Amino acid sequence: MKNTILILFTAFIALLGFFGMSAEALADPVADPLAGPNAEADPEAINWKGIAAMAKKLLG
């Protein structure tokens, strides 16, 4: 029984890592999942909204 729980827990953590869940996302379940990346939580995150706004501005 203990081994089964350990295996399931390990598989759960592996799936979270596979799908790119961060510790910040798990720690804050109230956060809006459709919001852009939090620059404070991940300084290397790509700011897609900023890139889209700049492309729209450049292309007219």
Curated annotation (Swiss-Prot):
GO terms for cellular component: extracellular region; membrane; other organism cell membrane. GO terms for molecular function: toxin activity. Expressed by the venom gland. AXPX repeats lie at residues 27-30, 31-34, 35-38, 41-44. InterPro entries: Mastoparan. It holds the Pfam family Mastoparan. Residues 1-27 form the signal peptide. It is found in: Secreted; Target cell membrane. One of its GO terms (biological process) is defense response to bacterium. The keyword Signal applies. The modification Leucine amide is found at L59. Antimicrobial and mast cell degranulating peptide. Has broad spectrum antibacterial activity against both Gram-positive and Gram-negative bacteria (S.aureus MIC=32-64 ug/ml, S.xylosus MIC=3 ug/ml, S.alactolyticus MIC=16 ug/ml, C.koseri MIC=4 ug/ml, E.coli MIC=8 ug/ml, K.pneumoniae MIC=64 ug/ml, P.aerugiosa MIC=256 ug/ml, S.choleraesuis MIC=32 ug/ml, S.typhimurium MIC=32 ug/ml, V.parahamelytics MIC=32 ug/ml). Affects membrane permeability of E.coli. Shows hemolytic activities on sheep, chicken and human erythrocytes. Belongs to the MCD family. Mastoparan subfamily. This is Mastoparan-V.
